[in-house]
A protein has these predicted regions:
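Non-catalytic cap/lid and distal C-terminal segments of serine-dependent acyl enzymes
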Residues: 1-120
Length: 120
């Protein structure tokens, strides 16, 4: 099954897959809040220090994504992508020029679903 979310919902979708990969093996996160909000900033370290799980991940963010006191969404998503790459996850990271919205992610969504269904 695939789980999807934007912003805190994107981090929540990843959290659900991380803790229940037998239920959700594919995650789509648009502008995921992997910043210092309820511990989501810890995921890059957890990914790097935990044996790889059976999860396929799509991340999307942009250079104008949110940047507030809890952190930079653009940098946080780049850190997530780097951690996933480090461990050898099947992942895709689309980094665009947009902000904290679904314009970019929505434009990619059909292709994202095709990629999610493809064997990696």
């Amino acid at each position: 099954r695939t789980i999807c979310g934007i912003s805190s919902g994107g981090a929540c979708a990843f959290n659900a897959a991380w803790h229940g990969p037998e239920h959700f093996g594919r995650v789509i996160s648009h502008c995921g809040s992997f910043t210092n909000i309820r511990g989501a900033h810890n995921y890059p370290y957890l990914i790097r220090s935990t044996p790889r799980k059976a999860i396929k991940v799509f991340l999307q963010s942009g250079e104008l994504d949110a940047d507030i006191v809890t952190g930079s969404w653009a940098l946080a998503n780049q850190q997530m992508a780097a951690a996933l790459d480090f461990v050898g996850y099947a992942y895709r990271f689309e980094f665009g020029t947009g902000g904290h919205n679904l314009r970019h992610g929505g434009a990619l969504f059909a292709d994202t679903l095709r990629w999610m269904d493809a064997d990696t």
